[in-house]
A protein has these predicted regions:
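Intrinsically disordered, low-complexity, charged terminal extensions of DNA damage-control enzymes
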Residues: 1-20, 25-26, 189-357
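Catalytic cores of DNA base-excision repair glycosylases
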Residues: 4, 9, 13-198, 204-213, ...
């Protein structure tokens, strides 16, 4: 199939079957495309939609985002995971507002220079917003191309990725680039899916290598799995006499960077001594909760929560910028890791149940 025939087939399929009413497709703007593309990294469309709507309602344009606090941005990202995406979004918003007066540049290289934006995201911004002829290569497109051509090897390898970029460039038409970009993404997301590709309705089925060989599930090849290490940590859920819970902001780098979390300890051993030394608190009562399992891309984490009631707390030179007392029934405008948010909700529900007895 010629490149022209390939793109025409995908475009004709899109006219009848493509997704045209996603939130970021309504009143399209570079800002909306950018936010949606960042959210869609590592996250499915169905999960992203409510987060995107809520985020855009609060931050309707790049200037509003740039003028907000990082804490609030992380708060609206809570639950999506991969929080470096939100931090980079915030950094880039400030750059665009300050250096470009709130307007996205039309240069691919300039957009790629922004934090968290690679070639595919930059291409999506330019093609979907301005109909510029730049290819994209997200996970959906990689899957379509590797299956269609029977490309062996993990797509994350530079050699394989370069080959895929060459094909993406070859098939991206100079006209109707915007429609083709959305079409090839939709084809991968809704037809050429990872687990159950629906080859019978695919516009490329007659000339697809994987379909012809019956090897759809062999492509794209997966990265060789390494053993994922396991880690343990203790979360101290410290409650004062007012029923407030102590949260501590994590360092900007590392896991859950910049988010607010329960104070963390390596072990429950001598935890009373460590809490008194660090925070000046005397412990009235403590109770261990059932461990919580949480998985990151590169390790499994077992969280062991301990609910600790504080008898008194001394006046101490605290850094109030990184320590906050919050009530579990409130919804603070802070970025919270999903397990922390879940534990706060559970704690509030437990308190309500006790009061209603």
């Amino acid at each position: 199939m010629s490149p022209q025939a390939f793109s025409d087939s995908v475009l004709n399929w899109f006219k009848q079957n493509g997704r045209k009413n996603l939130p970021w497709q309504i009143k399209v703007s570079p800002y909306k495309v950018w936010v949606s593309e960042i959210m869609l990294q590592q996250t499915q469309v169905i999960t992203v939609i409510p987060y995107f709507k809520r985020f855009i309602k609060r931050f309707p344009d790049v200037q509003t985002l740039a003028n907000s606090s990082l804490d609030e941005v992380l708060h609206y990202w809570t639950g999506l995971g991969y929080y470096a995406r939100a931090r980079n979004l915030y950094k880039t918003a400030k750059i665009i507002t300050k250096k470009y007066q709130g307007n996205f540049p039309l240069s691919l290289n300039e957009i790629m220079s922004f934090p968290g934006i690679g070639r595919s995201t930059a291409g999506a911004i330019l093609s979907l917003s301005y109909d510029k002829c730049f290819p994209i290569l997200d996970g959906n497109v990689k899957r379509v191309l590797t299956r269609y051509h029977g490309i062996k090897g993990w797509p994350g390898k530079k050699k394989i990725e370069n080959k895929l970029w060459s094909l993406a460039e070859l098939y991206t038409p100079r006209k109707l680039t915007k429609q083709y970009t959305q079409a090839i993404m939709d084809l991968g997301a809704t037809v050429c899916t990872r687990r159950k590709p629906d080859c019978d309705i695919c516009p490329l089925t007659l000339t697809c290598f994987a379909r012809e060989m019956g090897k759809q599930h062999d492509f794209p090849e997966k990265k060789l799995k390494s053993v994922i290490p396991k880690r343990d940590t203790v979360f101290a859920i410290m409650e004062n006499n007012n029923g407030e819970i102590l949260l501590e902001q994590r360092p900007s780098s590392g896991i859950w960077g910049g988010l607010w979390c329960f104070p963390e300890f390596l072990s429950h051993l001598r935890i009373e001594e460590m809490i008194k030394r660090k925070y000046g608190f005397n412990i009235k009562q403590q109770k261990e909760y059932k461990p919580i399992k949480h998985t990151f891309t590169h390790f499994h984490l077992t969280i062991r929560p301990i609910h600790i009631k504080i008898r008194i707390y001394k006046d101490k030179d605290y850094d109030t910028k990184v320590l906050k007392w919050i009530h579990p029934k409130t919804n603070p405008s802070l970025g919270l890791p999903a397990p922390v948010l879940s534990m706060l909700i559970d704690l509030n529900n437990t308190k309500r149940a006790v009061l209603n007895e």
